[in-house]
Amino acid sequence: RDLGSRFPGSKEMVDIALRNAINKGYIVGPRMLVATFGIGATGGHFDPTGGYRDMIFGREPDWSDGIADGPDAIRKAVRFEVKNGADVIKAAVSGGVFSLADEVDVPQFTPAEMAALVDETHRLRKKVAVHCHGDSAGKEAIEAGVDSIEHGSFLKPETLTLMKNKGTYLTPTLMPVEYIMSKIDSYPAPVQAKARAAATAREEMFRNAVKLGVKMSFGTDAGVFPHGQNAKEFKLMVDLGMPAIDALKTATGNAADLFGIAQKVGTLEKGKLADVIAMPGDPTSDITATERVSFVMKEGKIIRNGPPSASPVAEAGETLTEIPGD
């Protein structure tokens, strides 16, 4: 699941183009569910001007950039993205760590806007995921019926209990804050302050979520840290009290359930797609084995059998439309 692509000043939805190219067999790649632009409020976390004057962006961003104010504009933004091929809708309903113009715990949607976001997305039979760190915004989003909360750093036990009761998924994304904290002095002062607060809060939040039995899915916010390190999220989950088998389920059966595709993927069962990975070692006893994947099969086709250099694409030295040996 790719939860957003944004190139300031451009309306190109490159994630849709990439997904379509993979699905048509033009290039080799993973099965993708994409969100296109994230939807957010003027001056909020997804506002591409980032708190600067609009001349930096070239113009004032609008609903076609994902920036929408008021229920009607939000519905229009949802329709625009679905029209262009979005599989899932992503919105930012609280401030963020990297956005300079907002506080991380301040709600950015009104209750009416939140209701419009959820209603329109579900009416079009799509799932809605929301970026949310703050507790009050999280509670409003859960009550409105969002399908998942991304991050949830400051969610209190009462709000996590509400998630449990409503069946809302939490995607904790522990790795980004871990990475930011490893180089905290390189960021602007406002980012440092928010990152430190989130780093402290997320550990207690995650432990509470595990204890309460909140449903969780795997996500990393990759891009905040270099791609290719996604599997490190598993160890962070386990280190904070989640059993290894449950951590693995967040990226398999749980994820498929959240996405509404559990009838096709998520578990190895007769009648489902043959999506398989393998690694040396037992990840239930050493979760870091997930960082050493040596075999990848997609729909019964071998994509990798050996270290990364053994990938059919890497061996060929060029992009292929078919896996050798088919």
What is the role of each PLM region?
Residues 1-126, 159-161, 166-186:
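Divalent-metal coordination cores built from histidine and acidic residues
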Residues 32, 85, 89, 121, ...:
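Divalent metal-coordination and catalytic microenvironments
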Residues 143-148, 164-170, 187-190, 213-215, ...:
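Glycine-enriched alpha-helix->loop->beta-strand junction motifs that scaffold or abut catalytic
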Residues 301, 305-326:
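Extracellular/periplasmic ectodomains of large secreted or surface enzymes and adhesion receptors
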Residues 15, 44-48, 99-101, 138-144, ...:
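Histidine/acidic-residue-rich catalytic or RNA/ligand-binding cores of hydrolases
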Residues 147-154, 170-172, 296:
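Short hydrophobic/aromatic-enriched beta-strand-loop microsegments
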Residues 123-127, 187-190, 198-283, 302:
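His/Asp/Glu-enriched, well-ordered alpha-helical/loop segment
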Residues 79, 115, 119, 139-142, ...:
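Alpha-helical segments flanking ligand/cofactor-binding loops in enzyme cores
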